[in-house]
Amino acid sequence: MDFRKTFLLFSLPFLFSGIFAQNKAINQNDSAGRKTGIWETYYESGRVKSRGTFNVGHPVGELTKYYPGGIVQAVMNFDETGRISYVKMFYETGNLASEGKYIDQKKDSVWNYFSTYDKRKAVSETYQMGKKHGLSYKYYVGGSPSEMHEWQNNLKNGKWEQYYENDQVRIAGGFVADSLNGAFVSYNPDGSLSITGSYQMGAMHGTWTYYSETGEEEFSVEYIDGRMLPNAEMDKRIDEFSKKVKDIIGDIDEIENPENF
């Protein structure tokens, strides 16, 4: 008898039984009905959507999620309790989109977000149990910070600064409960004053002073709860200085929905 045929004849049953055993080992529950062992989910196309290992109903170790085309969408590494995970999320290009930590499926500690175009870190935010709490930064292409906000309980609360690319402070101010509040100062690129004033819960209030590009004082105006008091000099130059203020503070919006990562 041909020994190769004999080997194949006896090995086939074991081969197929091994395949069936592997398939049987996927997506199992323990006696209490909890997920255990390797679990996979699938798209309608049949492609794997997620793959990970479970113990007494929660994920442990590495869990990977995939886009419909098979590209890795996220890699999550869980501790033995399943409560804490360290996550990397990816664009469909394969480039890193964000990385950070979850506790009980809520963002915690520092999260970094990356540009899909040049792979650079674009934003970093600090979270506490799903809410922004601490410092957040936006970055220039070169890597230096362009803006900093202080957050408390998901609201802008505290210090706020914008920077020129040479790290010189461009704007210094503050927020209370998401509203501009307190002293406001903007600087020219050489460090000289551009505008000084103050806000009262989102409204310009008190004396606002405007300076030339060389830092020389030009004139001052008074505001009460966002309303400018009559001022002849300002009446002459209202359009010019309104545009100046808008240009200076027009960049304070956050990037578009970083929470989507």
Which ranges hold each PLM region?
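Glycine/tyrosine- and acidic-biased, solvent-exposed loop/turn segments at the edges of beta-strands
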Residues: 19-261
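Bacterial Sec-dependent N-terminal signal peptides
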Residues: 1-26
